[in-house]
Regions:
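C-terminal transmembrane beta-barrel domains of outer membrane proteins
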Residues: 400-562
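Strand-connecting loop/turn motifs
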Residues: 121, 195, 220-222, 253-255, ...
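Transmembrane beta-strand segments of outer-membrane beta-barrel domains in Gram-negative
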Residues: 280, 285-438, 442
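Periplasmic polypeptide-binding modules associated with outer-membrane biogenesis and secretion
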Residues: 2-4, 24-233, 245, 263-271, ...
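Transmembrane beta-barrel strands of outer-membrane/channel proteins
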Residues: 202, 227-231, 260-264, 290-294, ...
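Residues that define the transmembrane beta-barrel architecture of outer-membrane proteins
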Residues: 209, 238-242, 269-273, 311-315, ...
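Outer-membrane beta-barrel translocator/receptor signature
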Residues: 208-211, 222-229, 235-260, 264-277, ...
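Residue-level signature of outer-membrane beta-barrel architecture
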Residues: 217, 248-250, 279-281, 321-323, ...
């Protein structure tokens, strides 16, 4: 390249670096930065000149030099460790062999900084440093925003040890570039621990390019409890139900939790209780849990003459691990091993049947918040469950055998999928869409079937209206917030399913569809009181359970948290 162009560029870059040096004395790299930070400016700006006088002034040497161009042959990066250099080279490859100016070099630096941002290095900056360009080779310097000191301040009443906080933050290594993805994950894993409230701040440290992290861990209420009243039951099992829940956060001061839940239905026709415990294992977000539950029922209504009663005992072990843990995107891997022991009696005729269902489930739970179409929230859940039904009494096992029985005895597999989307439409209007699916490998026991009716399905029908082996449920809601406390919504529900995966040769068509529509209201007020109400009319045939048809059908729930 001509020596005059080379010298002019050197002058331009040098003058730019001098301005940056005045702005941030002590910085190791001088020049034009690109990144989340703004470009360096002189500490003291000169007084503004009169416009007429300015027109007569000659063009400053730096401006003239900045317009000098040369053919770019290569770009070299210094200070790179957080991202592959090949990606940086790919970002600037389109400029190689072209004539460039200082302004073009600043664009190259901005492109390189964008690569860092995509990798989560929000504090990284890319500079055009002071240099003399030889043979078209330009050097870009990177300040990656390395982590300096990590300071942890623990409130005296915080139910957590300093070691657990420090080990959870260990993914953030001092001396290495501060990655925003790792930073979010570490802080969210801390916030997932019950009983504490972590806060953090990043500040510029003393060493060049280093950033110090300060983490403050406060305490939350250790005991949380709530009450819920609803009409989700049926006429035969007790329509109105009262549920109480209690959580003891971090009882062993390790981020664990102990939970108790009890429910009693109207007339004590149904009673349920569950105790569970969950604890973190290691410091990467893995949690292991276990629970014991018991349910008892006594059916009334038309079944009363037979005096039907039942008992179910359930034990389970579970785990959860966050594959992705970010503010906008989360992906959890979850698994469960459970054992159900069920006894049903018809005391009036002296008949008892006993069953055991045990199995293993593995699933994924995904959620994401985005700005598409004005903003929205998406969730996806999938689980594959492999289980086995053992019918313990000979009489029931005999009548389960084909061709007169449905052959539920033995191993089975079922897949369940759920998807939902909440989408912004207008300042006071949003759309919610939800769908659920179940597919089975064979005929299932009633305890493993999918219910097409109820408050979480087609709301114009009772819980247990249609129990299916294979089926789907879909809903759409148009939501309109009346104020900060109340939201009115209109909905339409639909479902379809086959009561048995494989019907008997002489069975009629056992598939059924349900439709319903209606209005609902969600209301909450300060003091942790929440009320949910839905009123639904059926769009298909009359209901066959819960005493027949109810039109409209009303579901409501009142919750109070303490």
């Amino acid at each position: 390249m001509p020596s005059i162009n080379r010298n002019l560029l050197a002058v331009a870059v040098a003058l730019t670096g001098m301005a940056a040096a005045q702005a941030r004395a002590g910085d190791a790299l001088l020049g034009t930065p690109a990144g989340d930070g703004s470009a360096a400016t002189p500490a003291t700006a000169p007084a503004a000149a009169d416009p007429q006088q300015a027109q007569s002034l000659p063009e400053p040497p730096v401006a003239a030099a900045a317009q000098a161009s040369f053919v770019l042959r290569a770009v070299e990066f210094s200070g790179v460790s957080g991202v592959p250099e090949a990606e940086l080279q790919s970002a600037v490859a389109g400029w190689i062999g072209k004539s460039v100016t200082l302004a073009d070099l600043e664009q190259l630096a901005a492109r390189a900084a964008a690569v860092y941002r995509r990798h989560g290095f929000a504090l990284a900056q890319v500079f055009v440093p002071v240099q003399e360009v030889v043979d078209g080779r330009v050097r870009l310097s990177v300040v990656e925003g390395r982590l300096g000191a990590v300071d942890i301040e623990l409130a005296p009443d915080a139910p957590i040890t300093r070691e657990r906080v420090a080990r959870t933050l260990a993914i953030l290594e001092p001396g290495k570039p501060l990655n925003n993805h790792d930073y979010e994950r570490a802080m969210l894993l801390l916030s997932d621990l019950p009983g504490i409230r972590p806060q953090s701040a990043v500040s510029f440290g003393g060493a060049s390019g280093n950033n110090d992290l300060s983490v403050r861990v406060g305490a939350q209420a250790r005991l949380k409890y709530g009450l819920e009243l609803d009409d989700y039951g049926t006429r035969d099992s007790g329509r109105v139900r009262l549920t109480g829940s209690l959580r003891w956060a971090s009882p062993f001061e390790r981020g664990d939790n102990l939970d108790l839940r009890v429910m009693a239905a109207q007339g004590m026709h149904t009673a349920f209780g569950r105790i569970s415990y969950e604890s973190p294992v290691g410091y990467s977000g893995l949690r292991l849990g276990g629970g014991l539950a018991r349910v008892q029922y006594e059916l009334g209504g038309p079944f009363a003459p037979l005096k039907p009663t039942g008992v179910g005992n359930v034990a389970d072990l579970s785990f959860s691990y966050p594959l992705i843990r970010q503010r906008t995107t989360n992906l959890f891997l979850r698994g469960v091993v459970d054992d159900k022991r069920l006894t049903d009696r018809f005391e009036a005729v002296g008949f008892t049947t006993r069953k055991r269902i045990h199995g293993v489930g593995l699933g994924l739970a995904f959620e994401r918040r985005d700005r598409w179409g004005g903003g929205g929230y998406t969730s996806l859940n999938a689980q594959l469950y492999r289980g086995r039904l053992d019918i313990r009494d000979a009489f029931s096992r005999f009548f389960d055998q084909p061709p007169f029985g449905y052959g539920t005895q033995g191993g089975f597999t079922k897949l369940t999928l759920q998807a939902a989307r909440l989408q912004y439409l207008a300042p006071k209007l949003s759309l919610f869409l939800g769908a659920g699916l179940q597919r089975a490998s064979k005929n299932l026991d009633a305890y493993e079937k999918l219910s097409l009716g109820g408050p979480k399905a087609v709301r114009a029908y009772a819980i247990g209206e249609v129990l299916v082996d294979d089926g789907w449920i879909a809903t759409a809601e148009l939501r309109h917030p009346l104020n900060a406390q109340a939201t009115l919504f209109a909905f339409y529900d639909a479902a379809h399913g086959d009561q048995f995966h494989r019907s008997r040769p002489f069975d009629p068509d056992l598939s059924r569809s349900l439709r319903g529509y209606g209005l609902g209201l969600n209301w909450s007020k300060p003091g942790n009181v929440t009320v949910n109400l839905s009123v639904a009319w059926r769009g298909t045939g009359p209901g066959l359970t819960d005493g027949g048809d109810r039109k409209p059908r009303v579901f409501w729930t009142i919750q109070k948290a303490f």
